[in-house]
Amino acid sequence: MSAATVSNSPSKWLVLPHYAFAAVSFVVLCLLLVFSTDAFGGHYFHPKLLTLTHVAALGWATMIIFGSVYQLLPVVLEVRLYSEKLGTAAFALLSTGTVLLTISFWNFWVGTIMHIAACLLFIAFVLFATNVVQTARQVKKWGIEADFMVTSVVWLVATGLVGVLMVFNFQYPFLPQDHVHYLKLHAHIGMAGWFLLLIVGVGSKLIPMFLLAHPEDNRSLHWSYYLINGGLVLFAADHLFLHTGLYALYAAMVVSGIACFLYFLKQAKGMGKRPDLDLGMKQTFVALTLLILPIVLVFVVTLQLGLPQRLLSALYLVYGLSIFFGFVSALILGQTFKTLPFIVWMHSYEDYVGRFKTPMPKDLYSVTLLRWQNIAYLVGLVGLLAGVLLAEQNIILLGAVLLSVASVLYAGNVFKVLLHKVKDLKPFGYEKAAKGTN
């Protein structure tokens, strides 16, 4: 990473609280899952399932993405972050809104508290989007990565707007269709528009960098951008206005866009100069492999296959879980220990490099905890998905407990890095000087 990029980095007090809040949210999410096994036997529009979804989407995934973007945006775009004050305000609003919305959904309070939570979250999204767009405007050489990142925040604001309208519609019905109709729109533009586009934009820059690869041909990324956005725009227009029901076609466009991104990563991996992958990168490729399940299921749930209603409801649940607990969570679990240790190391040891013997970023966390975290996570995920599909609460509970173990190991490792202190640094030549005096 260049010196210019390091100098563009924002204050650690903007970035690190996002990681702390996200780690706690992941533990809360998995513990709530333990107490929600009874909610997986029916429709996905259930207070406990809505709670789990929003803790996963907001407190866990969006929170850590906000913090990561503040740190990585200067890396990807090679400019300074537009405003740290906007970032701090967005963090305060996102964290407060997430807590209030979680309480509201768990108890299904559809009144004032839920309204306030939705408004706080929407304002947080607008502030974050403003920060990203204004930062991107400073770019001298615009690339496809900037297209992905700027477009993703547009979809984030759109997702938040639909969410606000739905929240107020609970108490003051004014939308022409039922809640489930808009929930599908809200969920899909959030998952594919916000999460997927941002992951592709950042991943197309960072994953080759971690692999020590420098692919110059990014035509597949351009195809990815237009296919994903084209499918989303057509889906939203059809869902709201046209009602042709060609959802499988739009899904195929988005999936084709994902395939183009994966092809780009395949090229990068082939060019990579790093022969051995660490646990973080292995987990990242596990996350990409986990994409296969929701890709298959999106066609199963959109095509009229005449499946029994109980099975179809279970497949809808597995589809959603495979995205948030599967792909997104696995990616975060893998990338956290590629990014967070470097951020803490940079702010702790930047002034000592070259003069003192300093630890490496990988020395700041426990590889043993990370290894057991990954094992507990994968076994727990398989148990959770199998239990939902088979409608077996005991298997769901086993999966939830293992995921809770993984979340505690993850949080412990995160706070080990966050609480790292500089101590007992020895200058270069110290050992030789010490031997010379003996």
Regions found by a protein language model. Give the residues of each.
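Hydrophobic alpha-helical transmembrane segments of multi-pass integral membrane proteins
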Residues: 1-438
